[in-house]
Regions:
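Membrane-embedded alpha-helical bundles of multi-pass enzymes
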Residues: 1-202
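Soluble catalytic regions of membrane-associated enzymes that act on cell-envelope
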Residues: 197-317
């Protein structure tokens, strides 16, 4: 029972960065759903899967402290434990009705996107294929992303895998699942076909013209990474890292993105003119718009996140 789930959890985290074996997401889901459906203890199976897979994926936050990583890993395990229990219960009650089980999958994905602590949307199954498809010549994958979005794409991946699992496990209902698969493919390819036709022939909007823009994401660094590490002028040095990397950009770009905490405190463009002036110089040189993340203190022990958009004239919009 747990062997399938353990294999599934290992394949799952291997499909995510930094390992990037994106194609392992498919056998991972196969072993997960088959493991849950065959398990006599679906809660335990879900718990094992969630704790192992997300424990590895989230391991980076141990730089904050193990008191952050361990509870969150256990919480994800409990979340998948309840999911496994509910999934098996509904499967038994509905005699493995494919479309009802899809409803359970989509409801859980929606819950996980917002809970706990604001959700974990980049842990979706489709996330691994955002970069994975670039390693293939299968150009349909970007179109699926554009048509259904990452959440819808995740549901498609999981639903197709579940359909294969049910087809393998349920010998007496193969004809039923063949009919279900036909309906499911019609539901998928109807909007996808419309999207591809419009993308190719511009059927729905004659005035719509696609235009590429050049975007640069500037990822600076801290001289002392980790929440427990401290060094002198850390925030100033983080800002300097971003501005210096931006100065190394040699050609004009449409949009420059600085991530969260790249500015703030004593380096806030809204408060400190020298910081805004530094950025305006780069705006003029690169003829770029800037999207900048930062944080500022609001009380002695608290801070708030902010985002700034600076147009190509150097004005904060």
């Amino acid at each position: 029972m747990n062997t399938r789930v353990i294999i599934s959890s290992v394949l799952f985290f291997l499909s995510f960065p930094p390992f990037n074996f994106w194609y392992l997401i498919f056998p991972s889901l196969f072993f997960f759903y088959s493991g849950i459906l065959l398990s006599s203890k679906p809660f335990l199976s879900g718990l094992v899967f969630g704790a192992i897979s997300f424990g590895v994926i989230l391991f980076g936050i141990q730089s904050i402290g193990y008191e952050a990583w361990i509870p969150l890993s256990l919480l994800m395990g409990l979340l998948y434990g309840f999911y496994g229990k509910l999934f098996k219960f509904i499967a038994v009650k509905t005699n493995n009705n494919f479309f009802i089980l899809i409803g359970i999958i989509s409801t859980f994905d929606l819950l996980r996107a917002y809970f706990p602590f604001g959700g974990f949307p980049w842990g979706s199954t489709s996330t691994v294929l955002i970069s994975g498809y670039r390693d293939t010549s299968f150009n349909l994958l970007p179109s699926i992303f554009k048509t259904f979005g990452p959440t819808g794409y995740s549901l498609i991946i999981q639903s197709l895998t579940l359909l294969i699992v049910l087809f393998v496990l349920e010998n007496k209902k193969k004809y039923t699942y063949l009919k279900d698969s036909l309906v499911f493919f019609i539901l998928i390819f109807t909007p996808l076909s419309l999207f591809l036709l419009n993308d190719s022939f511009n059927l729905l909007d004659k005035n719509n013209k696609s235009e590429q823009i050049s975007v640069v994401i500037v990822q600076g660094n801290s001289p002392c990474p980790g929440a427990k590490n401290r060094c002198n002028n850390e925030r100033a040095r983080i800002y300097e890292s971003h501005i210096n990397l931006t100065k190394s950009i040699s050609s004009e770009k449409d949009l420059i993105i600085w991530p969260e905490s790249s500015t703030g405190f004593n380096n806030d463009p809204l408060i400190h003119d020298r910081v805004l002036t530094d950025i305006q110089i780069e705006v003029e040189r690169l003829n770029s718009y800037f999207l900048i993340g930062g944080d500022r203190p609001i009380r002695e022990a608290n801070f708030e996140n902010y985002g700034l958009f600076i147009n190509n004239e150097g004005t904060i919009v």
